[in-house]
Swiss-Prot record:
InterPro entries membership: Chemokine_b/g/d, Chemokine_CC_CS, Chemokine_IL8-like_dom, Interleukin_8-like_sf
Species this chain originates from: Rattus norvegicus
Family, as annotated: Belongs to the intercrine beta (chemokine CC) family.
UniProt function note: Chemoattractant for blood monocytes, memory T-helper cells and eosinophils. Causes the release of histamine from basophils and activates eosinophils. May activate several chemokine receptors including CCR1, CCR3, CCR4 and CCR5. May also be an agonist of the G protein-coupled receptor GPR75. Together with GPR75, may play a role in neuron survival through activation of a downstream signaling pathway involving the PI3, Akt and MAP kinases. By activating GPR75 may also play a role in insulin secretion by islet cells.
Keywords from the UniProt entry: Chemotaxis, Cytokine, Disulfide bond, Inflammatory response, Secreted, Signal
Protein name as it appears in the record: C-C motif chemokine 5
């Protein structure tokens, strides 16, 4: 079975995005995490179970997605895919 180069590249990019998430870090004594970088690619929506916004004490506003494996991943709230995922999670 032959796989196209585009399909192979897509699989590699998705795997790389999942293997190198941008973790959320707690801010001082506050247990609410802050984000210092955003995930560059969209997560597969099926991997996301919930989300929350970072605290106003954080220097960067971010959405933190919690995956099915309980990993916290930072995302840019201005990105279209992030807004779509939030809407999807709110509706389900």
């Amino acid at each position: 079975m032959k796989i196209s180069a585009a399909a192979s590249l897509t699989v590699i990019l998705v795997a790389a995005a999942l293997c190198t998430p941008v973790p959320a870090s707690p801010y001082g004594s506050d247990t609410t995490p802050c984000c210092f970088a955003y995930l560059s690619l969209a997560l597969p929506r099926a991997h996301v179970k919930e989300y929350f916004y970072t605290s106003s004490k954080c220097s960067n506003l971010a959405v933190v997605f919690v995956t099915r494996r309980n990993r916290q991943v930072c995302a840019n709230p201005e990105k279209k895919w992030v807004q779509e995922y939030i809407n999807y999670l709110e509706m389900s």
